[in-house]
């Protein structure tokens, strides 16, 4: 084990930036051998320079840029190697899909939307009772017939259905939704020995009439509906931005690994062309 890495100083960072401006990104050995920068960067390896430059690049862009600057891949370096020391060949990286912790994927459910929307969705799924689930259009059509809702409610409905599915309150089958079997088959116990009175499906209940009247005449409820739609849109955009950031970081890492392999291949070719014997020693990939 080597000595512990020291924290980068501002002088070393300035020297690294100046070296990249002079020789370009990826020319870490050339920057180290440059008399202008070697006194300052003598204690750093080419891997240290590469990692530090990546951190500086991400810090400058804030990981939020839609265009990722991929370092230019150049040809083999013309500087000869004076020794035939074993060449360290980094092991191949294992790229896996970025996953979030289970707690991070769960979005807050309480206090964000009005309680009656969830009840309206549950009522629609219970009445439709499709074995393979009902799609968003069918659920929206049922609710629109029962209650006076705005046309923008459909956009909010998709977000609400995803939340209910994430919280295991409903089941998602492809692009359709249905109630769990435990809820779909649950029947209330009778209050007395006589058979319960059947409701006429064509006549909405008193609660439904009250909700529909309130929805059509209350400016406060319309404002709450518009705010809920904006919240749902913001959450969807934030999720898409996070996915794009993770994909950009993955592509940037792939470009760096490709550049490293090209540098190693160029050095192997340079040594073999001079008749030197090159030994490849695999090393374990560091975890980032």
From Swiss-Prot:
One cellular component (GO) term of this entry: nucleus
HTH myb-type domain mapped to chain residues: 1-60
GO biological process: nucleosome assembly
Any coiled-coil regions, as ranges: 230-250
GO molecular-function terms, A-Z: double-stranded telomeric DNA binding; protein homodimerization activity; single-stranded telomeric DNA binding
Superkingdom of the organism of origin: Eukaryota
Entry keywords, A to Z: Chromosome, Coiled coil, DNA-binding, Nucleus, Telomere, Transcription, Transcription regulation
Cellular compartments annotated: Nucleus; Chromosome; Nucleus, Nucleolus; Chromosome, Telomere
SMART domains tied to this protein: H15, SANT
Domain H15: 113-181
Residue segments, region Disordered: 1-42, 62-87, 181-206
Family from the record: Belongs to the histone H1/H5 family. SMH subfamily.
Domain writeup: HTH myb-type domain confers double-stranded telomeric DNA-binding while the H15 domain is involved in non-specific DNA-protein interaction and multimerization.
Protein name from the UniProt record: Single myb histone 4
């Amino acid at each position: 084990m080597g000595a512990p890495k020291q924290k980068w100083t501002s002088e070393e960072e300035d020297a690294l930036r100046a070296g990249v401006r002079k020789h370009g990104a990826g020319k870490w050995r050339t920057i180290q051998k440059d008399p202008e920068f070697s006194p300052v960067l003598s204690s750093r390896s080419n891997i240290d320079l590469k990692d530090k430059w990546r951190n500086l690049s991400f810090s400058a862009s804030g990981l939020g840029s839609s265009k990722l600057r991929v370092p230019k891949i150049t040809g083999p370096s013309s500087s000869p190697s004076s020794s035939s020391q074993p060449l360290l060949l980094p092991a191949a990286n294992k790229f896996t899909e970025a996953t979030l912790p289970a707690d991070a994927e769960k979005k807050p459910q309480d206090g964000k939307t009005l309680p009656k929307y969830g009840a309206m969705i549950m009522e629609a799924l219970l009445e439709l009772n499709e074995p393979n689930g009902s799609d968003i259009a069918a659920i929206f059509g049922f609710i629109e017939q029962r209650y006076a809702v705005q046309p923008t409610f459909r956009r909010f409905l998709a977000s609400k259905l995803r939340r209910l599915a994430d919280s295991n309150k409903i089941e998602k089958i492809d692009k359709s939704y249905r109630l769990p079997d435990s809820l779909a088959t649950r029947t209330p116990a009778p209050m007395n020995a006589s058979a319960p009175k059947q409701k006429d499906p064509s006549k909405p209940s008193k609660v439904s009439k009250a909700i529909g009247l309130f929805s059509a005449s209350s400016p406060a409820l319309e404002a709450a509906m518009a705010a809920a739609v904006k919240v749902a849109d913001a959450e969807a955009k934030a999720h898409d931005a996070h996915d794009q950031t993770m994909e950009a970081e993955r592509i940037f890492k792939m470009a760096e690994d490709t550049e490293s392999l090209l540098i190693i291949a160029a050095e192997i070719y340079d040594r073999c062309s001079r008749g030197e014997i090159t030994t490849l020693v695999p090393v374990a990939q560091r975890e980032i």
